[in-house]
A protein has these predicted regions:
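Cell wall/extracellular polymer interaction/catalysis modules
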Residues: 1-158
Length: 158
């Protein structure tokens, strides 16, 4: 399975994007995304990860995993963990609404607020998006399929 995040707006506190399933060369929209902003020099918990392609595995330890087992029950097989990101660790794909919920992770949502002007950006209906997007990815991983995610920058970060 191949996923792609297209980042299209990076502002002072956040980056807006969209997530696609691009398996087999067909681009299928999955949901909107929100991450921390671009920074030349990383600030712990306040910086989006570099563009590139990374593998995803399931992480079955840690606080997020325990909370998601309670929240989502049998649907939850482990946190979607974006692996081997240079200078970053424990980058997860999870629910949340604003840049305050990201700490470098990728938030999913079914709606999105612009992140320019007085807004820091926001994704809405995050739990609904997660409940829809998570199961096929977790299933692919459980069946031994390789899952990758490519982060592509279409935003101006200069």
């Amino acid at each position: 399975m191949e996923l792609e995040v297209l980042r299209f707006s990076s502002q002072k506190d956040s980056t807006n994007g969209v997530l696609f399933d691009v398996t087999g060369g067909i681009r299928k929209f999955l949901c909107y995304t929100l991450e921390d902003e671009y920074r030349e020099d990383k600030v712990m918990g306040e910086t989006r990860i570099p563009s590139g392609t990374y593998n995803i595995t399931l992480r079955t330890t840690g606080g997020f995993h325990g909370r998601y087992v309670k929240k989502y029950g049998q649907m939850h097989k482990g946190m979607l963990w974006v692996r081997d990101v240079p200078g970053f660790e424990y980058i997860l794909i999870h629910t949340g609404n604003t840049d305050e919920h990201t700490a470098g992770c990728l938030l999913l949502g079914d709606s999105q607020q612009a992140n320019f002007g007085s807004s820091d950006g926001m994704v809405g209906s995050s739990v609904n998006a997660y409940k829809r997007v998570y199961p096929p990815i977790a299933k692919a991983l459980e069946e031994g399929e390789s899952v990758s995610i490519t982060y592509t920058n279409f935003d101006y970060v200069g």
